[in-house]
From Swiss-Prot:
Cofactor binding, per record: Binds 2 heme b groups non-covalently.
Protein's GO biological process: mitochondrial electron transport, ubiquinol to cytochrome c
Additional facts recorded: Heme 1 (or BL or b562) is low-potential and absorbs at about 562 nm, and heme 2 (or BH or b566) is high-potential and absorbs at about 566 nm.
Quaternary data: The cytochrome bc1 complex contains 3 respiratory subunits (MT-CYB, CYC1 and UQCRFS1), 2 core proteins (UQCRC1 and UQCRC2) and probably 6 low-molecular weight proteins.
Entry keyword annotation includes Lipid metabolism: no
Gene: MT-CYB
Family indicated by similarity: Belongs to the cytochrome b family.
Species this chain originates from: Eunectes murinus (Green anaconda)
GO molecular function: metal ion binding; ubiquinol-cytochrome-c reductase activity
Protein's name according to its UniProt entry: Cytochrome b
Key word Heme present: yes
Length: 370
């Protein structure tokens, strides 16, 4: 439809009548992004990117800065909310075939990579024990790259070990990357409205559309209100629910935590990394766990867009969702049996979903012909 961007500005964008609550997570991600930028700015004003002062500056923000505890907790728990929303957003895209809008899907995958990088850099900034060791383990994976690995690692660290230059670089990257995320998000929305949103049926909705405002704005506001209430409840009553106990101790390069692990939203990728007992193989599997999302639009073989009428694919999809949760769970456990074996099997099933996707589509087409 021509002039969709102009119509969107006035809330008159025609949208399918049957899009469900699963389509609300895009606007919720926008709200999360706004919250993160605002709280992040106020935290950056008081934060000191120095290995001797970073941990103390976080304590100073929490104890001495007016409403600093609120800003710090909103920023930390807001990141978790961001990832909950983005994982549901991706799952909806996979289930309802939104990935067939290729440009939007590929820009979204790039957004996910950028978001994960930003969150990783942010996790290092408090310079707690788990921050330091998670940074050491993850950045050390660069050394697995043939020929260039050691040079790249030294360049990223700013020396031969994680030290003050590393923290300064990570703070600079954590500050600048959100602006890239905002730019890419704008491109993502523009590309989406070139073709328009999909819908649960996966059909062309041109014959049955309504203006975005007021119908879908109120629907979005309801979910935003629920998310805000949930966020404030966690901030008020359980602000440390997603934090690692080790991160309440200042970073000590001489003491290794019993079990090094990143934030919960990276555990699925970390679990896949851990399931391969080889450094280069693990690093490749970690990268592929995200990059493989880019292959989905090109391996779709079914004549139907949505999984709504595809029982075989529905079963495969929910197995994939369960696999994601199992990998996350095993990554929280020590590297010992039976967790290692469960993690390896779940990691295999994770990649098997993307391989079985085109096969299932082809099989369903065959069944429909008979």
């Amino acid at each position: 439809m021509p002039h969709q961007q102009i119509l969107m500005l006035f809330g008159l964008l025609p949208v399918a009548t049957n899009i469900s609550t699963w389509w609300n997570f895009g606007s919720m991600l926008l709200a999360c992004s706004t919250l993160q930028v605002l709280t992040g700015f106020f935290l950056a004003v008081h934060y000191t990117a120095n290995i001797n002062l970073a941990f103390s500056s976080i304590i100073h923000i929490t104890r001495d800065v007016p409403y600093g505890w609120l800003m710090q907790n909103l920023h930390a728990i807001g990141a978790s909310m961001f990832f909950i929303c983005i994982y549901i957003h991706i799952a909806r895209g996979l289930y309802y075939g939104s990935y067939l809008n290729k440009e939007t899907w590929l820009s979204g995958t790039m957004l996910l990579i950028m978001l994960m990088a930003t969150a990783f850099f942010g996790y290092v900034l408090p310079w707690g024990q788990m921050s330091f060791w998670a940074a050491t383990v993850i950045t050390n994976l660069l050394t697995a790259i043939p020929y260039l690995g050691n040079t790249m690692t030294t360049w990223l660290w700013g020396g031969f070990a994680i030290n003050d230059p590393t923290l300064t670089r990570f703070f600079a990257l954590h500050f600048i990357l959100p602006f890239g995320i905002i730019s890419l998000s704008s491109l993502h929305v523009i590309l989406l409205h070139e073709e328009g949103s999909s819908n649960p049926l996966g059909t062309n909705p041109d014959i049955d559309k309504i203006p975005f405002h007021p119908y879908h704005t109120y629907k979005d506001l309801l979910m935003l209100t629920i998310m805000t209430i949930l966020l404030l409840l966690i901030v008020s009553f359980s602000p440390d629910i997603f934090n690692d106990p080790d991160n309440f101790s200042k970073a000590n390069p001489l003491v290794t935590p019993q079990h090094i692990k990143p934030e919960w939203y990276f555990l699925f990728a970390y679990g896949i990394l851990r399931s391969i007992p080889n450094k280069l193989g693990g690093a490749l599997a970690l990268t592929m766990s995200i990059i493989i999302l880019m292959t989905v639009p090109f391996t779709h073989t079914s004549k139907m867009r949505s999984m709504m009428f595809r029982p075989f694919m529905q079963m495969t999809f929910w197995m994939f969702a369960a696999t994601f949760l199992v990998i996350t769970w095993t990554a929280t456990k020590p590297v010992e049996q039976p967790f290692t074996l469960i993690g390896q099997m779940a990691s295999m099933l994770y990649f098997l979903f993307f391989i079985s996707n085109p096969i299932m589509g082809w099989l369903e087409n065959k069944i429909m012909k008979t």
